[in-house]
Amino acid sequence: MPFADFVAALKDNPYFGAGFGLVGVGTALALTRKGAQFGMIAFRRHYMITLEVPSKDKSYQWLLSWISHYAKNTQHLSVETSYLQHESGRISTKFDFVPSPGNHFIWYRSKWIRIERNREKQMIDLHTGTPWESVTFTALGTNRNIFFNILQEARELALKQQVGKTVMYNAVGAEWRQFGFPRRRRPLSSVVLEQGISEKIVQDVKGFIENPKWYSDRGIPYRRGYLLYGPPGCGKSSFITALAGELEYSICLMSLSDSSLSDDRLNHLLSVAPQQSIILLEDVDAAFVSRDLNKQNPTAYQGMGRLTFSGLLNALDGVASTEARIVFMTTNHIDRLDPALIRPGRVDVKQYVGHCTNWQLSQMFLRFYPDQTAGQSEAFASAALSSSDKISAAQVQGHFMMHKTDPDGAIQNVCLATM
């Protein structure tokens, strides 16, 4: 059969014509779909702007709060439970609804913004056990200012929730994470130290914060170290907490006896500590002791973790140590500390915080019972010191708590409380 006749026969075949038509339609639809996909990709690349924020970024929680503030009409929600501490000290539970994983649309400054919250089910954070998440913002246009404005608003919204409070951070892995809920700032006047001690430290810290240029002009590393030492319960940690509130700083808590703490991790944590924060190393004598004692008891000197003594020294003032840093250390036994740890440059200010004096006892009495006279406060101080000359601030506070509304009872029973 000639080829021309074969083609003519195919044209006259209705089944072939129908099949060829379907193939043509399918091909056209496929090409149209591919063209639409490429067109959408090109449109998004040239006429849309996208911002992705992973859950490890510090602004992630800020943005979730911001989204819940703007996406009030969304019907797909997740719940976040938090605790609130009231002025009275009472703690209540608060439930916040945030958009669940998926796509959400909000109207912001005359623009529609698509928000996609993704949750990876196959990957989790080993420290918290929570899945990895990310939030992606997509908007029309190429102006980045819209995302900058969103981040600024989210930050301001988060800061409003922390006004009048002190934020505590704890070292988790290679980063600092907020520990618990922000605490009400403790007034500096609520911690009564011996006359002049509080004022001396506050003046020194503020002078350090306000004069970075003085350090740079003289080539001095811009960092400051403090050591508060003395018997337990005398107000060392309480004063640091109140000082952070006075400066409107946060506190970064770090345990040197943490078994997972190594030299590299300590260096990294000190370098990424939140700005405007005090790094607090409590009970440093529990992690390291004097090298003289090391010869007698090498196991105790090594501590519980992988952190070495030389690693700690280098982190405090070595070549790789960071600047613009305030470190407070506390100890109950300064004699157990190696002189190399507390030399100038690593510890610039050493301050003894001891047992209560007559003046301290009088001031504490007047603070708990502001309506009482100076004569009654002196009577309380004299009675307390006559029974013992080693009274801690924690003991006095516990005694006052037993006589909240009975100042006379506090004076009469002080001997029993200090025995």
Curated annotation (Swiss-Prot):
Side Mitochondrial matrix, residues: 33-419
Record membrane topology: Single-pass membrane protein
Top EC class for this record: hydrolase
Positions that bind ATP: G230, P231, P232, G233, C234, G235, K236, S237
A GO MF label: ATP binding
CDD domains from the UniProt entry: RecA-like_BCS1 (cd19510)
GO cellular component, one term: mitochondrial inner membrane
Mitochondrial intermembrane topological domain: 1-15
EC number: 3.6.1.-
Similarity remark: Belongs to the AAA ATPase family. BCS1 subfamily.
Descriptive protein name: Mitochondrial chaperone BCS1
Organism expressing this protein natively: Xenopus laevis (African clawed frog)
Gene encoding the protein: bcs1l
